[in-house]
């Protein structure tokens, strides 16, 4: 399917978010790390699980580091590009140029705003009572070059592991299914949706206020952004990327913004390879990402076209 006209979408999005806000049933929780855990005032649409009676899931088995006692995790690990998207605690952009080569200097992880540590496992942080290493041969979080082995085996190819969405209280990952909730819609997303729609509808002050409300969450406490126009939208894009990280939004956001073919073509992902305290900036997999413009519309299945002579394929897919 293709997308509706922008103006109608913006009005619909604004009105829908406004109606939710007016219910006064939802709010931001103080601790960002609790925002996606469900059973709180931020969760709007939540799917619950039970490890014993079911339904349950295996998210932890897919993403935990090897030191959790399970050898088949870390199927996806955060990239250096994602890490560099985080501002410092004062809301400023961090200069990572020194780590775009080889250095023994410790990265500025402790300077980054609170949502970073709540989202990503990095060298020196604590995970399930262990200080993480994330290095070549590391005991707690080992590094592995891309395709060094046939499977991930719980090792990182970027120097990082995912923390967000995992159950830190789950000790027996190998023998126990996961039961943490999946929050499909939470109030922070509603505020950001409304902010974006307000921006499109030239409600600049309201857009700023809504985004700054998310940034000002009690446990995050980032200063507000006063930018406007295209500069505000760029700030908004990054704010949405950080706040909703790994919740399944960014790819679809880039599609609806019609920016994927610009930023996701010939795009490569990087990481930090850590060897005996030396940090080396690396190309994670040596592959260019591709996003041809025809991916903005989904093709009509060939079987449907064969079954109905009146159906035509989209021009992009002919």
Question: What are the language-model segments listed below?
Answer:
Residues 6-72, 76, 80, 88-318:
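Acidic/polar-rich alpha-helix caps and helix-coil junctions
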Residues 1-5:
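Single conserved hydrophobic/aromatic residue that forms the stacking wall/gate
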């Amino acid at each position: 399917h293709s997308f509706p006209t922008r103006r109608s979408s913006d009005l619909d999005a604004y009105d829908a978010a406004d109606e939710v806000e007016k219910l006064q049933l939802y709010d931001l929780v103080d601790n960002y790390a609790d925002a996606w855990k469900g059973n709180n005032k931020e969760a709007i649409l939540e799917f619950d699980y039970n490890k014993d009676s079911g339904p349950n899931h295996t998210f932890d088995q897919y993403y935990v580091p090897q030191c959790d006692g399970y050898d088949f995790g870390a199927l996806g690990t955060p990239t250096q590009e994602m890490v560099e998207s985080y501002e410092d605690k004062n809301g400023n952009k961090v200069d990572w140029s020194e780590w775009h080569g080889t250095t023994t200097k410790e990265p500025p992880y402790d300077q980054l705003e609170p949502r970073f540590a709540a989202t990503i496992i990095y060298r020196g942080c604590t995970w399930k009572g262990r200080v993480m290493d994330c290095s070549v041969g590391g005991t707690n979080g080992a590094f592995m070059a891309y395709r060094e082995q046939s499977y991930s085996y719980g090792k990182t190819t970027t120097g990082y592991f995912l923390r967000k969405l995992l159950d830190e209280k789950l000790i027996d990952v190998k023998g126990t299914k996961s039961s943490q909730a999946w929050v499909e819609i939470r109030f922070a997303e509603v505020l950001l949706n409304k902010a974006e729609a307000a921006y499109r509808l030239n409600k600049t002050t309201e857009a700023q206020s809504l985004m700054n409300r998310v940034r000002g969450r009690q446990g995050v406490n980032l200063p507000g952004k006063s930018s406007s126009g295209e500069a505000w939208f760029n700030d908004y894009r990054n704010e949405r990327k950080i706040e909703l990280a790994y919740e399944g939004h960014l790819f679809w956001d880039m599609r609806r913004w019609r920016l994927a073919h610009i930023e996701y073509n010939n795009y490569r992902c990087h990481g930090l390879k850590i060897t005996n305290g030396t940090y080396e900036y690396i190309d994670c997999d040596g592959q260019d990402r591709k996003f041809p413009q025809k991916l903005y519309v989904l093709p009509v299945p060939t079987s449907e076209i064969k079954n109905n002579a009146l159906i035509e394929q989209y021009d992009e897919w002919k």
